[in-house]
């Protein structure tokens, strides 16, 4: 009887998981308007063991970014670069509902190219309920200055990926190539596979 119940419960749980995944996929990409409540509940995060002062600086930036997106960019995507070693912060860069191009912003691009390795954090919001994009991963991997990248969703949730001292660009690039091949070109699936293996090549993630 216990085995029967276990099998039934397992099937029920798996069905619930499939339904939840299907709902997430259905809702993915639909813009969520930013509310004051979402801004207030942005959590304190400390990527790569950041101290409290740095974590507070990151939290305040995430809140300011959402407020800027809410009031000045129709809840669309906005990005901002921080220098975690100096406490400097660049102006917000506006995007649209699906993307923001920090490389097209002169000041941001200059930082990406000239700041010391592992000194910069790139923060941006996602209007929909999506995760890191392929372009996010490209920018994160290819610019030595970028140590951490964060997504703060329009509902106030924060995800981060950070390079550790063991970051291996060649291994990470090879891992992404394998993930793309394994996923038959499905970018979302490739990113999921890639990030599941991220600790192998020196990337720390939090969610």
Provide a role label for each language-model segment.
Residues 1-31:
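Contiguous alpha-helical segments
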Residues 82-86, 125-127, 143-144, 151-157:
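Short, flexible beta-strand-to-coil junctions
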Residues 77-79, 120, 147:
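Residue-level detector of short, conserved catalytic/binding motifs and their immediate flanks
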Residues 68-75, 139-147:
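Short, surface-exposed loop and linker segments with low hydrophobicity and enrichment for Pro/Ser/Thr
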Residues 89-90, 130-132, 159:
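Short active-site-adjacent helix-start/loop capping segments
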Residues 28-116, 180-207:
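Glycine-rich short-loop/terminal segments
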Residues 95-145:
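Short HxH-centered metal-ligating active-site micro-motif
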